[in-house]
Structures are given as C-alpha cells and as structure tokens.
C-alpha cells in the first residue's frame, strides 16, 4: 500500500532498518533493538517510564522471544496483516509486505517468542509478576504515557515500547507485552505504522485470542500498540491501546479491539485481564473485558487501569505499588474487586487514522460491539479506588499516565489542547495526585485527551475524535456481571456501554451505550462508561464519552474529577469507603453529541447504586453535553477538569469544598470544556458533596460557556455534568453537600431559569460547602453561597449561568443523572440522592423523579410518588416547602435549606432514587421535556423510551432495560431535548442500584422552557433529597419549564420502597407530597407539559369510557390551539428563505471568486509565497518519496518509465501541443505524464520548463524524447518543464520530481519538480483523463501524459493532451492534429475532471471565464491552479507568456505553457470549442488542473483548491465544460482555441491548463 505520501511500505518492509526508518525515522529503535533490549527500547521510546521494571520483565520476556518459532497468534496476525503494508511497519522493519510471514516470524524470532516461550513466559511471569510486576512497571507506565510506553506499566510491556496497552499489569501481562512486543513490532508497527494503511487490518484482530488471553493478547495487541507507538511517531499513545490487564490467564481474549485493542480477560481473578484497546485505532478502542472476579483481579485491574501503563498507571497514579493502590485493593476495594478488570481502554492514536472500520471487536462476547462502536475509548476502571484511570490519550496524546499521580499531564496531540491541558492540569494538582486529565478543552481535535490522569483519577479519555470509539468497560462488581451486562449492552446501539448490571448492587455498569447511538450521532463518541461500583462505594465511572465527534473535547476533566473525586478520593479517600468515582466525561458536541451525552447520563443511573443504599454507587455521568450542543459545546469540553479536584474534599464536605472551589475555578476556565462532570460518591458525604458540587459546577461552567456567566454558564452548558454522588455519609455536612449538590442541580435548572435559581442554590450550597468553592467558577452566586455553604454558591452561580444556558440546561438534564446511589438507608446519606436529583438539568431530574410526571399529569403523580417516600419531601421537590433545605437549595428561597432539612432531604433522596426508578415518572418527564424541546416529537420518543424502562421495572431491571432502551431513548431525547430521557435513565439506574439512587435527571427540556420544567423536576428529587426546593425554584424560574416539578418524583418513593412501587405509583403519584406545591407558574407549566405529553403520546386505542375520560384525553389538545399556517405564511417563509439563500449564495460566490483571485495572484507570483514554501516543506517528504519511486521505476522498469514519458512527449508534433500539455504535464511533471498517462500512443513527451524560479515555464514536447520522457519522465518531465523551451530538454531529469498524492482527491497524484528552488508541477494525476488513472506510473506521470491522451475519456481528452497542444501546436506544432495525442497530459487533467482534468481546476473557473475571454482566463486559470501556485506560477507565467503572452507560469500553466507555445499561438480557437466539447471534462479538467497545480501546492493548498474547484465545478462545469477540455487541450485562452479543434482533449489538457490559467 502506498503511504499517503507515496512511499510504499512494501519498499521497506523487507528491510527492518528501512522499515523502521520509514515508520519512525532512523532515530527510532529497530524492532530488533526493541525486542532485544526492552530497556533500551523503552528508554528510547519512553524515556520517562520506569524502565527498571520493564527491564526485568523484558529480560524475562526476551529470553522467550529468543526462541525463533513464531507464535501461532502471530501467524494469524500475519494473515490479517499481510496484505497491508501497514503490517509491515512496525518498530522493527519486519519482513516486507512481500513476505509478511517472514516478517512476523522474524519479529518473533528476534524476540524469541514462540508458543513455548509464551507459555513459559506466562507461567513465569504470571506468578511472579502479578502484582509486583505492576509496581515496577508502573513507573514505566507513567512515562510511557508520553511514549505510549504506558505499556511499561508492566515491565514486560515496557519491553516493547510500542504497546502500552500491553501492559498487563502483572507479570503475565508483562508476558503479554513481550510477546506482543515482538509481534507488535510486526503487527503493531504494521498496523500502527501505517495505521492509516493498516487500519483496516485491525490489529485488534490480530490480537491473538490465545487462550492464554494474556499471551495471546499481548501478541496482537501489544503489537498493535507498539505499532501505534512506533508506527506513528506522532502518536506514541497508539501503543497504548493494548492494555493487558494482568490476568494471568486471561480467559478471554476478550474481544479484539476493533483495531488494535485487544482484550484479554482474566480467567482468574488474579489474572489480569488484558484489555487492550486498540491503540491503533482509536475507535477500536478496545474493550475491556474484565472478567476477573477476585480481588486479585482487582490487581489486574490496576494494571489495566493504567492506561498506558496500566498497572503502572495506577501506580503512577499515585501509588508506587503500581497497582493503583486503591485499585488493587481498591479494585477489590470493594465489591469492586470482583469486577476488577476494568480497564479497557483503548487508545486511539490520534493521529493515526483509525481504522474505523475495525471495530470488529471480537471482543469478548461481552462487549464486542459496544466498544467498537464508539471509537472512543473509555477507560473504565472497575475499581473505584483503583480507578486508576487508564488514561488514554485519545489520540495523539499520549497519555501520560504519569507514574506520578499528580503528574497527569495530558498530552494533547494538539498544541491548543495542550495548553488547555495545562490548565486543566492545575486542577489535578489540586486534586491530589489525581490530576484531572485535562481535556483538551476546546481542542478542536478530538485527540486531545487528556486524560491523564494517573491512575488516581479515572480518566476517561476522550474518545477520539473518531467518532467514536469509545469503549467503556465497566466491570460489574463481579466480573461475571460485567460480561452479562456487556452482553446486554451490546445490544444497545451504542452499545457502547456495558451496563453492568447484573447485580444491581455492586457496580452496575452503567455505561450507557446510549452512547453508541451517539456515536452514530457522530460526534458523539460518547461512550461513557460507568464503572459500576461494586461495593457501596466503589464507584466507577466513567461515563462519559465525549461525544464530540469532532471535538476531542473529551472530558478528561471528569476524569480528573473522577480522579479527584474518585481517584483522588480513592487515594486519599480510599479511606472513605465511597471511593466511588464517577467520571463523566462528556463531551458534548453541541449537537448530536450533546444528546448523546445525555444518554450518558441516563446510563449513569445505572449506577449501581447501591441497591444497598450505599451512596457510593453513584455514577454520575451525565450527558451534559446535550445542552452543550445548544450551547457551545466545545466549551464544556475542556473545562470540566476542575472537578477532579473535588475529590480532595472527600474528607469533609467543607474541607472538600475549598478544594472544590479551587477546582471549580479552574473549571470555569475550563468551563468551556464543560461537560464533563464527574461525580464521585465518596463514601463519605463530604467527598460526595464536593464532587457533586464540583461536577455541578463543571456543568455550570459548561453551560456557562454558553452563557456569559463565566463559571456557571459553562457548567451549565455542560449538561453532561453529572452530579451525583452522594455518599451515604451520615455526616451532616456530607448530607449538606449532597443537598447542595442537589441544590446545585436544582439551581442549575434555576440557573437556566435565572437568578431565582441562584438564590435557592445558595441555600443548598450551604449544606454543600464543598461545592461552593467549585461554584466559585460561577462567580456570581458563588460568593454568597460560598460563605455559608460552598456548595450553595456554586449552585447559585450555576443557576444564573444556567438561565442563559437554560436551553442548554434542558439538554443538560441528562447529565443530571445523578447517580445517586445515595444510600437510602441513611437519611443523611440521602444527600447522594440529592445529588442525583441534581439532575443538573432540571428537567432530567424530573424525569427521573416524579418529575417524570413532567408531563403535566405525570408530574403530579410524581409528586405524589415523592411524597410517598417522604410526604414532605415529595412536595419539597416540587416546592421548597417540602423540604426547607431542599427548597432553599432549589431556589434562593431554598436557601433556608439547611443541613437539618438536609437529613430529611436525604431521606427523601433515597426515595427519589426510587422515584427515578419509577418508570412512570420518568416517562412523563420525558414527555415533558420533549414538549418543551423544539423537537418535541423526538422527545416524546425519548420519553416513551424512557418510560418504558422506568416502568419496566424495579430498579435493577429497569436499569438494565433502561440501558438498553435508554440508548435509543437517550439518543432520542437528546435530540428532542431528550436530555430528560437520559436523565431518567440514569435515574432509573440509580434507583436500581439503590433506592436512593435517586433520580437521574431526566433529560432536560429541549427548549429552555422545557428545561425549566426539567429543572423543576430535578429540584423535586432534590427536594426529596433536599433538592425539592430547587425544584420549586426552578419551577419558578423556569416556570415555563414546568417540568421541573417532575423532579419531585424522585423523592417519591421511600428509599425503602422498591422502585417497583414507586414506579407504579409514579403515575398514580404514589404519594403526593402536598407539602411542596409548585408555584403557579410551575403548575401551569406542568399542566401544559402534561397536556403536551398527552398529545404527543396519545392513548388512541382505548374507547372513551366516559365523558370525563374523553374530556381528559381531548382537552390537552388545546395546546395545539391556533391557526394553521396560511399560504401567505408559507410564501413569506419561502421569500425569506430565498432571500437568505440568495445572499448566502452570493457570499459564497464572492468568497470563491476572491479565493480564485487570490489563487490567480498567487499563481502569478514569480517567487514562491510563504504559503507555497510551507506547502513545499510539507510535501517535501512526499516529493522525495515520489522521486525515489520515479528513480526506482526508471531503474527497474525503464520501459514503463519511458512509455509514460513518451506518452507525455509522444508526438513531437504534439510537442507544441505537448508543450502545452507538458506545460501542464511537466508542470506536474507527472501531469504531463498523467495527461499522457494514456501511454497509449503519445510517445511525445511534454516538457515543461521553468525559465526561472519564477520564470515562465516553457513546455516542450519531445517526440523523440519519449525515451527521455520515460527515463526523465518524471525527472525529465520536470526537466521538460525546465527545458520547456527545448523540446528535447525534457529528457534531462535534473530537477527532482516530487509526487504528491492528494488524499482528498482519490487517486490524484501530483508530481512536482523542484528547480531553482521552485517547484513545478510536472504531473498532475488530476489532469490525467479519468481512464488515465493508469498513468499510475505516477512517477512518470509527466512522461505519461501522452499515454494519457488515449485514455482521455473523449478522444478529445486524449487530444486534450495532444490536441491541447495541437491546437496551440497548430500554430506551433500540430497542436490540433496532435491534440489527440497531446491529450495525454491534458487528458490527465481532463480525465480527472472529465478528461479535462488538467485544466479542470483552473479550467473550470477558467473554462467558464475563458469562454468569454480566453486570454484573461489563463491567468485566472493559473490562479485556480494556485493550489500549485508555486509551480503553477512559474509555469503559468510561461503559459501566459505563451498563451496570453502573459508571464504567469503555472505548473498547470506549464501544460498551458506547453500549449502556450502552441496554445499561445492558437490560443483563441480551441478554447471556445473545447469548452463546448469539453464541457464535462472541463469540470474535471478544472479540478484536474487544480491538481497539477495542487501538486505543486501542498496537499493543503490542493485541498483548498479542490474544495473551491468542487464548488465551482457545478457552475464551472457548465461554462467550463468545453472550456476545460479546451483549456486542457489548449493553453489557456488562446490555446483553447487551438485545442478547440481537438478542442476536447486538447482543450482539456492544455486548454485545461490554459483555461485554468485564463480562468484563474
């Protein structure tokens, strides 16, 4: 396969050194070195990592590798990889593609990897290395991050730098790595190196599935990883993908990651699982399988967790031990242990193209699809504490999972992101070691990921930009669970998520696959994953996925958050049982993404919640992104990080608060990056609170970003943020925190509403002091709240921002999904519930809560529901009254919300969880939301979906269902405003886990109003928890939002009550808490929403049993009261549309014209512009490759080379025409060739010569020169360019020729000759006739032009080259007569366009313009060519001189020039005809010509030009059609006429050029 730049792996595959150089540059180690000296290699690749450990492993491994036998796995890899050069790549050069088997074997031999060795290795490594290895590895891992060495984590992994993923944590993983290492080089390198090429190959597939999952895994995956790392220098991370959990026996190889990832699952608990994701393909993020069950597993987890160095990562995270401390144990720390493996992480290499397709994941059955779908990789940590996140750089960046916890740094692939990362970074510092990963914030590129976080935090790396691959894996507590869940999830579309579900307890995974859909959505990558937490506290997290497709904005933040909360917590808080962490990372692309995110939120609900009631389980993830879409999603992206800091607070709410504040502040900056939020539910309330707040804030900021509010707004916009987390903590403060959180959420809703919310928020905040600080970002409220309770401030702040972001808010709801796992048992714990309520989006909460009632009617029931749990509370949710504190939180009034109320709130909260459970409630909410949302219809869908799930069942079941359903629902919701839906889902999830799980927020209302309602509902749950007040506030503020009330529902059932009950009650409104009464506005809104819901989801099947029933069912249609649009209305709209569209069209035209003008000017420049210089530099490498290829061709296949040359120079007569053509072709050097491409008969060679650097190029046809052409064809062609004047000159090849391949343009190649510092396009494939593609002798394209002619689609096309020249030649040579021959060149161009390719780019415009004024057009055409401007300019000058007598030489012009000689002489004639004849060609020609010029240009330029040409094409085509050919055929204006005779082809070729020139 050819490299994009024209190099072919095949050329270097056999030579390891060459291959290595090819892939990585000579400085990289050869594969041999890598294999043999793991330490060295690592150092080379990963300087930072702790090689020490690696070495040990490495040694161990190396010996094994020594054995030559290739492993089976490798063999199968070979097969996969074989056809692709990518395969060939690899750190070492493996065998050539020609001998793929050899390559693999070679690698294996070098590495001494044989089946036996692998087995031995596994045995040896596993036992001894298991944990220990990890630790040593971890040091490496951190460093790896950068290098992608993360792999180091496992010593062995370290061995091969390439695979980070490999890192099995443990020895075994190590083994894996090693194995992988060896193969990796082959495989990986191949894959990686070429990731682009290979992508499809899908290392992942390669991964072996050997039973010894580890070993097998490693083979493939590491390789992949390695490849990634190696292959792309840029991306070190790539290697990462492979992650090996340590499972000594990985039972399953889990699935292959689509691309490179590999999964290994551990058979034994102890075994590490290897989960590697495909590093290569981002999308393939692998999945994780975690299969382990035992604590041991946990260990493995640790390993995995490390993202890069999985195990190491953990350690790096914070613990030396390598396993994330917490993790290992933590993993197990709690139930987690059981679900230890969790990491899956996939690394996408940013830079590499991902094989998106890969996704094949054979992933374990479990997850196979899910991950694949989303490209994003998520890391999930199974263990809360452990969470070491796998940081993964989503793409480029490498993850630095630094060994140090604090160290997380995010590497972003992009500079910008990097900056952001730094910013983010700081929060991490705060956090403890868990630096938040910084999302690259705004990065536009998805790549950035930041994640960074060391193990501490969980990071979810963003997925890549790719759309998606996310993978999440969350193991359930029990490994088994996971699988189950996975399986279920897979069903989901997005499937990304695995739900964890099995046990409701423990960690449910909540990932929502919803994401998957999101992926669909495109942006969304969301693949959030939740880590379920098993134990009460374990939390996991992650959820979020960045939806951004485009945006990388992954939220690392969340990670940080998570890290902070969780991880950090875990580190620090490990103490706290509730280590749970949630990560939410959401990115929300504003658009679809946001929605997707929402779903995320839903998933969150899955939070295991602790059925137990443990607060820990919160998952929080919310899709905040939804809103962001509305708002500026991007913002949200980066910001969230701050949250990470929260964790520190865990100890005490207040204490935490300050940290939070700190974090938040960063947050605001991050704010833009807002979406992600992480909620961690620390065991203790405080931490939870903090997290929550932070997350809230995060949300806010995001939202804010939308809004002016700096801090808050972003958060708001981040709908994704999820808040939720509540520890069961008994502490009042903790509860307060939760409340605050709730409040925050509520406020958030309020925010959207406006200040009112703020006030309440403050109160809420008070309880949550921690949050307060976080809220600080939202400056406005912050202060007030801050004082009393930090939380409040944030909340309040949030509210303000929210209002503006209101709409966003709506979307945000999903993020709501608070996971509250709040423990139902403890009232205080309720707090967590509150968090849930948080529902950031008011709406969402409603959905989850009674809010679901959101639709007017539903709400009431909700309320009742809430009531049942706590009579007062339910009301509270609705109104502040129900719980003073809640109320306060809810709104300013809520301010009163005091800690005291908090307790009740807490209690309520639990119920709320249940409330969320209630399907009914959620459904309504959903309805509600939808209505408000602009896209009401969709919402309805969402609602329905949600509903089903909720109703579906008791929490656990519902949860699961939800997951499944949710995705669609969520998705829907998102769109519709579906936020609510998501939230609901989450709610139900939460409930499932625990009654308290409290609601998820239901989605937010799509529209601002709806949002308000949503918010209101959220408050309700909060209220129940203590959020209720919020609700009211929201209601008030969002009176329009009516839905807010819905939230109340959450409160609805007592924690104790089964969700089922609540569920049932939901509609009935289990118990209405009359206490809280929504404001009139809220009630009114509620009714409207109810009605809207009724109308949107009418019961059209049952008869009207009574008048009352009929009235009840029909009355809601009043919402549709109003007149249908009248014809005049339609007319008016049409007129407006026409006006706007016309204006837009004009602007577009003006822009295009301007661009063309610029191009023209550029083409006329004598000296290259900075742009051209830059392009030259960019393409120099490619050019070198092309030259090498040409030389090789000339040496190896002179005949071919000559023939192409000849084509170019085919007829000497054509010479004149050729000149013209050549001008073009030579221009392109290949262009002529291309033109000639039709090697057919034109032996004539077209030579374009640039007189001076800027001088006009002269084109000559060398009839006799054919040989010259062939030998020189490329160089000669270039020469020709130089020797333009001398027909024979072409034969000299003194100028080197570069060939550019335009990726955008398929099959287009440009050849540029560099002369006197100028580049000339000798050959432009674009110019070649369509059939010409054969000119393939791209190298000889120039020479080929003549041949091209034959291909010219139309004879004219052929003539294009020939004719082209001929027409011009007519005067000069036999342009016309020859035209047919000449066409080659022109042909090429024309061909490209339509056989008018050469002239096409310029031709199109030129053609059009040219019709009128041929002479002028040429100049223009040149301009068009500007892409090739530089060369073009020189040639164009020539061309002009010749054709127009204008000086503009253009590479294309060179063709034109060639024609110029002839063309110029006969310029006028052909063009006209040509245009006509070449009409189709013209367009192509136009484009084509662009190509040649493009050749000169850099790819970028070319692409710009191409775009323009494409735009122009339609118009240009018509006008240019004949013209293009004419242009091709002839030089610009004049030549066209000449060409005209042959018009078609000649025009195409020269004309095309000329035309281009003229046109330009």
From Swiss-Prot:
Please give the residue positions where the record annotates the modification Phosphoserine. 919, 1413
Give the linked disease: Coffin-Siris syndrome 12: A form of Coffin-Siris syndrome, a congenital multiple malformation syndrome with broad phenotypic and genetic variability. Cardinal features are intellectual disability, coarse facial features, hypertrichosis, and hypoplastic or absent fifth digit nails or phalanges. Additional features include malformations of the cardiac, gastrointestinal, genitourinary, and/or central nervous systems. Sucking/feeding difficulties, poor growth, ophthalmologic abnormalities, hearing impairment, and spinal anomalies are common findings.
User: Low complexity: which segments have biased composition?
Assistant: 624-664, 747-780, 881-896, 1005-1028, 1264-1281, 1401-1412
**UniProt cross-references to PANTHER family, sorted A to Z:** BRD4-INTERACTING CHROMATIN-REMODELING COMPLEX-ASSOCIATED PROTEIN, GLIOMA TUMOR SUPPRESSOR CANDIDATE REGION GENE 1
Q: What is this protein called?
A: BRD4-interacting chromatin-remodeling complex-associated protein
Crosslink position(s): Glycyl lysine isopeptide (Lys-Gly) (interchain with G-Cter in SUMO2): 1313
Residue ranges annotated as compositionally biased, kind Polar residues, are 1227-1236, 1485-1515
> Per UniProt, what is the name of the gene that codes for the protein in this document?
BICRA
Task: State its role.
Answer: Component of SWI/SNF chromatin remodeling subcomplex GBAF that carries out key enzymatic activities, changing chromatin structure by altering DNA-histone contacts within a nucleosome in an ATP-dependent manner. May play a role in BRD4-mediated gene transcription.
MF GO annotations:
transcription regulator activator activity
Q: Which GO terms describe its cellular component?
A: chromatin; GBAF complex; nucleus; SWI/SNF complex
How the protein is affected by changing residue 64 to D? In CSS12; uncertain significance
The subunit structure is: Component of the multiprotein chromatin-remodeling complexes SWI/SNF: SWI/SNF-A (BAF), SWI/SNF-B (PBAF) and related complexes. The canonical complex contains a catalytic subunit (either SMARCA4/BRG1/BAF190A or SMARCA2/BRM/BAF190B) and at least SMARCE1, ACTL6A/BAF53, SMARCC1/BAF155, SMARCC2/BAF170, and SMARCB1/SNF5/BAF47. Other subunits specific to each of the complexes may also be present permitting several possible combinations developmentally and tissue specific.
Its main subcellular localisation, reduced to a broad class, is nucleus
Keywords for this protein = Acetylation, Disease variant, Intellectual disability, Isopeptide bond, Nucleus, Phosphoprotein, Ubl conjugation
Where in this protein does the record put region Disordered?
53-99, 624-688, 723-949, 974-1028, 1049-1075, 1215-1300, 1324-1424, 1440-1560
Query: What spans are recorded as compositionally biased (Gly residues)?
Result: 86-96
Modified residue annotations for Phosphothreonine: 921
Q: In which tissues is it expressed?
A: Expressed at moderate levels in heart, brain, placenta, skeletal muscle, and pancreas, and at lower levels in lung, liver and kidney.
Q: Tell me which residues bear N6-acetyllysine.
A: 1057
**Cellular compartment(s):** Nucleus
Q: Which organism is it from?
A: Homo sapiens
Q: Which InterPro entries match?
A: Chromatin_remod/trans_coact, GSCR1_dom
Ranges annotated as biased composition (Pro residues): 726-736, 791-806, 814-831, 843-880, 932-941, 1331-1356
Biological process terms in GO annotation: chromatin remodeling; negative regulation of cell differentiation; positive regulation of cell population proliferation; positive regulation of DNA-templated transcription; positive regulation of stem cell population maintenance; regulation of transcription by RNA polymerase II
